[in-house]
């Protein structure tokens, strides 16, 4: 699956775990932490920037919330 992110960035991932990993690897902020730490860090920044809380307990819920809030769109 291919996901469109803000700034016309695209992530190709076969599942939610791969999506989180690719999002982290492409991050200029948190590329050196674990995928789990990245989800938590991203969620903290997102609530400040967008005022929306996203789940971080599983990659599936994290991705689902990013799609629900409009940050990511499956294309």
Language model segments and positions:
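Acidic, aromatic-enriched beta-alpha/helix-loop junctions
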Residues: 20-57
